[in-house]
């Protein structure tokens, strides 16, 4: 089965021969390079323009740049995922086997992004001696899942694209964390963004239920089109998201709305220390 071609005469990125492994691997590498570039550009711009960034610890700067990179990927993923969920007639009519060239582009570049994300997270953990189990597991499963979709010409694209839609929360997470570090956690803008982010996490939970429904409704077609290890990986990852990761992150973000603390880097408060703290740190003047 070859990928379904989009209509149109003009040559474009969506009109490439995605049956070619060379094309798909090239776009995966391009995705890695592009998001590495976003990371580097964010560091350069923030170093030059942002006083808050310059005051951060090295590991916080890495997290800042990763948050911005994830936000850019989240915008791409949300747009692609919404179109697959609501607008594309080919994917809507065949949720198990339907393919589109524009989906191949997003699947391959997402593979490159998740490879970058895994490399960055592991290098950061190694250098700074930190470890976030949920984040590591989440991105490992994401990379392996999209790699499986990128190499399998028979795999349908609907579930892969709705998986991308799970990144809908990342732009809000980026804004939340940056404003938190700038000392704006009591501003109306931060609170509105936090409410929207929590809502996005609830939408993620609803979306995972929809993905389970698609799996049950189209089980035979999925089982015949996906390699068994890929299918098992997808189902196990979806189960982790549904039962553990999504509820945990939703709980933590709701806690953060009520108690604006940077729980990624906040140091344990010394016993008897009554000094008021903001964002897990001693309050300091707001700046951007």
Swiss-Prot record:
Organism of derivation: Rattus norvegicus
GO molecular function: ceramide binding
Task performed by this protein: Could play a role in cell proliferation during neuronal differentiation and in protection against cell death.
Motif ER-retrieval signal: where in chain: 285-288
Transmembrane regions listed in the UniProt entry: 26-46, 71-91, 103-123, 131-151, 225-245
Protein name (record): Protein CLN8
Underlying gene: Cln8
Subcellular location(s) of the protein: Endoplasmic reticulum membrane; Endoplasmic reticulum-Golgi intermediate compartment membrane; Endoplasmic reticulum
GO cellular component terms, semicolon-separated: endoplasmic reticulum; endoplasmic reticulum membrane; endoplasmic reticulum-Golgi intermediate compartment; endoplasmic reticulum-Golgi intermediate compartment membrane; mitochondrion; presynapse
Its membrane topology: Multi-pass membrane protein
InterPro entries with a match to the protein in the record: TLC-dom, TLCD
TLC domain location: 62-262
UniProt GO BP: adult locomotory behavior; adult walking behavior; apoptotic process; associative learning; ceramide metabolic process; cholesterol metabolic process; glutamate reuptake; lipid homeostasis
Key words, A-Z: Endoplasmic reticulum, Membrane, Transmembrane, Transmembrane helix
Record note on quaternary structure: Interacts with CLN5. Interacts with CLN3.
